[in-house]
Regions:
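A short, Lys/Arg-enriched interface patch at domain edges and termini
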Residues: 56-88
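Residues in flexible loops and secondary-structure boundaries
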Residues: 20, 45-49, 61, 69, ...
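Generic N-terminal initiation segments characterized by hydrophobic and/or small/turn-forming residues
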Residues: 7, 25, 55-58, 64, ...
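Short amphipathic alpha-helical surface micro-motifs
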Residues: 18-19, 33-36, 79-82, 89-91
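Proteins with a high burden of low-complexity, intrinsically disordered sequence enriched in S/T/G/P/A and R
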Residues: 13, 31, 38, 63, ...
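Basic helix-turn-helix/winged-helix DNA-binding cores
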Residues: 1-60, 69
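Terminal, intrinsically disordered low-complexity segments enriched in charged/polar
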Residues: 81-164
Length: 164
């Protein structure tokens, strides 16, 4: 089965994820092997098996890429994600959270006032509003896989409803 005819309702394979997120397979593999983020649907279990990622996994990977592009280390990203899981829960990706990073530290702001407060401290920071990343990912998947537009919309809706 070719990539364009793959039934993405089963999940997204590594090549699709790399295209949507804008990373190399090597990065994706490294992030999985080091425990930063692996596929939620299916791990690779030897030669010939494929990882299967959810829509939510792709959203998270897009956030990781943005933080990396801002100069944040994978160690700091991992710490921030663990902290968010502990404080907000596994559905933090659906919350109105803005992640701000100065390249060294990641701050999570849950209100516009917190964002302004962090910015007024005079630090140069890079901000990522997490919730809009859903729409960006959905749009990118629609652009890359137009034959699956309806399936992708359903996947995003299912992911948001399930909190995965």
């Amino acid at each position: 089965m070719t990539e364009s005819t793959t039934d993405i309702t089963l999940g997204f394979r590594s090549p699709q994820v790399c295209k949507v997120v804008g990373i190399t397979y090597r990065q994706l593999d490294y992030w999985d092997r080091t425990g930063l983020l692996g596929p939620s649907l299916q791990e690779a279990s030897g030669s010939g098996t494929q990882r299967l990622y959810t829509f939510q996994d792709i959203v998270t990977l897009r956030v990781v890429k943005r933080l990396k592009d801002a100069g944040t280390s994978l160690h700091k990203i991992r710490q921030a994600f663990d902290q968010l899981e502990a404080e907000v829960g596994s559905n933090w990706r659906e919350q109105d959270i803005t992640l701000l990073s100065d390249g060294t530290t990641i701050y999570a702001a849950t209100s516009p006032e917190e964002v302004v407060d962090l910015l007024q401290k005079g630090q140069g920071v890079f901000g990522i509003a997490v919730r809009p990343v859903h729409d960006e990912v959905r749009g990118e998947i629609h652009r890359l896989y137009p034959d699956h537009a309806e399936e992708v919309s359903d996947l995003g809706t299912i992911a948001e409803a399930a909190g995965t």
